From Swiss-Prot:
Pfam families assigned: LpxB (PF02684)
Record's GO cellular component terms: membrane
Catalytic activity: a lipid X + a UDP-2-N,3-O-bis[(3R)-3-hydroxyacyl]-alpha-D-glucosamine = a lipid A disaccharide + UDP + H(+)
Protein's organism: Alkalilimnicola ehrlichii (strain ATCC BAA-1101 / DSM 17681 / MLHE-1)
Coiled-coil zones: none
Gene name of this polypeptide: lpxB
Taxonomy of the source species: Bacteria, Pseudomonadati, Pseudomonadota, Gammaproteobacteria, Chromatiales
One GO BP annotation of this record: lipid A biosynthetic process
Membrane-crossing residue ranges in chain numbering: none
Single GO term (MF): lipid-A-disaccharide synthase activity
Identification of the protein by name: Lipid-A-disaccharide synthase
Top-rank EC class of the record's enzyme: transferase
EC number: 2.4.1.182
CDD domains (UniProt xref): Glycosyltransferase_GTB-type
Glycosyltransferase keyword on record: yes
């Protein structure tokens, strides 16, 4: 049994690692190759390219790197047509992976797409292309599965692996102890998550640093912690803190985002996977996000949903405050954080709703996804 997988960012690398583990538990002789990051490689994936070569976000940013992306795509298609795997799994990265899946399905390779493209949010006409490109969609969220069923696309709602990983009752005290934070009854902790990609952190660093300064003016005893996934991100963020004169107010960590959020009373985060993880950790949050101006202009005209953060999409309502583009100002963010820090009934309500949403996603996702992938491979496995 040979499984080809392609992931292009950290969240996909984590999903892919769990999937590989679960497939190997059922099929010990399975082999894995494709494109993945350190987590997938640690589970045995042979990666033909560095995952970072595919880690590009936003319409403008994709155009800048298009020649490289097309070259890698051509190579992968040629490689898997010449030496077909038993099944191909594209993990997220829809504009890249769906084109590979369509070409491989046309020559008889079973194809699975893990993580639904956001067709329910924008470019809904893509659902027909998806149906022609994949044998099965593995959806992380129930509303996604409902959308595909309405359009006649085979789909499994597998749940979200993060919902299985995070405890239903997180322990803030244990997280603070693990991070070496002094839990001395002082001021509240605010976690800052400006993003996991360089472009995101570059766009958000000054905004978040100025927000720290504004919030300290309102509530001087607030303490700040921030996880940055790698040293380059840390350097960009630290420079912004220095320029705003608040570098002494923020304790930086390399990685450890889960622990940092668990240790916090309130989280300020960019949109994306971090909003889901903050929800699973039952942490009240404020969401702030900026895109490249042209990308935002285009997205405003294409997107068909009212919310961008995972808690709001899951709940179907505006549970958490979202500040996007021009609305993401230091004054707005500082005031939103101040209100959350000083409104315990609201925070308690959010924690209770987050616990309900957590339960809907807790389904043993790695195992369910592995079973679906092996079923798609059918008699092709050995």
């Amino acid at each position: 049994m040979r499984v080809a997988l392609v992931a292009g960012e950290h969240s996909g690398d984590r999903l892919g690692a769990g999937l590989i583990r679960a497939i190997r538990a059922r099929c010990p002789e399975a082999e894995f190759d494709g494109v993945g990051g350190p987590l997938m490689q640690a589970e045995g994936l042979r990666s033909h390219y560095p995952m970072e070569a595919l880690s590009v976000m936003g319409l403008v940013e994709v155009l800048r790197h298009l020649p490289r992306l097309l070259r890698i795509r051509r190579d992968l298609v040629a490689r898997y047509r010449t030496d077909p795997p038993d099944v191909f799994v594209g993990i997220d990265l829809p504009d890249f992976n769906l084109s590979i899946e369509r070409r491989l399905k046309a020559v008889g390779v079973p194809t699975v797409h893990y993580v639904s493209p956001q067709v329910w949010a924008w470019r809904q006409g893509r659902v027909r292309t998806i149906g022609r490109s994949v044998d099965r969609i593995l959806a992380l969220y129930p509303f996604e599965a409902e959308f595909y069923r309405r359009h006649g696309v085979p789909v499994d709602f597998v749940g979200h692996p993060a919902a299985d990983r995070f405890p239903l009752q997180p322990d803030a005290g244990a997280a603070r102890a693990a991070l070496g934070l002094v839990d001395d009854g002082g001021g509240p902790w605010v976690a800052l998550l400006p993003g996991s990609r360089l472009g995101e952190v570059q766009r958000h660093a000054e905004l978040y640093a100025r927000t720290v300064a504004r919030l300290r003016e309102r509530q001087p005893d607030v303490r700040f912690i921030a996880p940055l996934a790698w040293p380059g991100l840390r350097a960009v963020f630290y420079e912004a803190l220095v320029q705003q004169g608040v570098s002494d107010a923020v304790q930086l960590f390399e990685g450890r985002a889960d622990e940092v959020m668990a240790a916090a009373d309130v989280v300020l985060t960019a949109s994306g996977t971090a909003t889901l993880e903050a929800m699973l950790l039952k942490r009240p949050m404020v969401v702030a996000y900026r895109l490249a101006p042209l990308t935002f202009w285009l997205m405003k005209r294409l997107v068909r949903v009212s919310h961008v953060s995972q808690p709001n999409l899951l709940a179907g309502e505006g549970l958490v405050e979202e500040y996007l583009q021009d609305a993401a100002t230091p004054d707005n963010l500082a005031y939103a954080l101040y209100r959350l820090l000083n409104d315990e009934p609201r925070s308690a309500y959010l924690r209770a709703r987050f616990a309900e949403l957590h339960g809907t996603l807790r389904r043993g996702a790695d195992g369910q996804a592995a079973a679906a992938v092996l079923a798609a491979a059918g008699g092709n496995g050995s």
